[in-house]
Amino acid sequence: MAQNSQNGNSSNQLLVPGAAQAIDQMKFEIASEFGVNLGAETTSRANGSVGGEITKRLVSFAQQNMSGQQF
């Protein structure tokens, strides 16, 4: 399996240039709020809580931006 040079084994591709930096900043801010030290020694439960919160906030942000728009 080919590796994405920016995200290790991730097959996700960001569509917006510079989004990786914003997502990383959000990840570390949320980890700090939750008292999680991100790294290889962190449990998957702790890492997962950070990832879940990122998803929750991104969905909320998208819903706010899309409110009132019809497709």
From Swiss-Prot:
Pfam families in alphabetical order: SASP
PROSITE patterns: SASP_1, SASP_2
GO biological process per UniProt: DNA topological change; sporulation resulting in formation of a cellular spore
Annotated positions for site Cleavage: E29, I30
InterPro entries reported for this sequence: SASP_alpha/beta-type, SASP_alpha/beta-type_CS, SASP_DNA-binding, SASP_sf_alpha/beta
Gene3D superfamilies listed in its UniProt record: Small, acid-soluble spore protein, alpha/beta type-like
Molecular functions (GO terms): double-stranded DNA binding
Alphabetized UniProt keyword annotations: DNA-binding, Sporulation
Family assignment from sequence similarity: Belongs to the alpha/beta-type SASP family.
Additional detail: SASP are degraded in the first minutes of spore germination and provide amino acids for both new protein synthesis and metabolism.
Function of the protein: SASP are bound to spore DNA. They are double-stranded DNA-binding proteins that cause DNA to change to an a-like conformation. They protect the DNA backbone from chemical and enzymatic cleavage and are thus involved in dormant spore's high resistance to UV light.
Entry protein name: Small, acid-soluble spore protein 2
Organism: Bacillus subtilis
Lineage: Bacteria, Bacillati, Bacillota, Bacilli, Bacillales
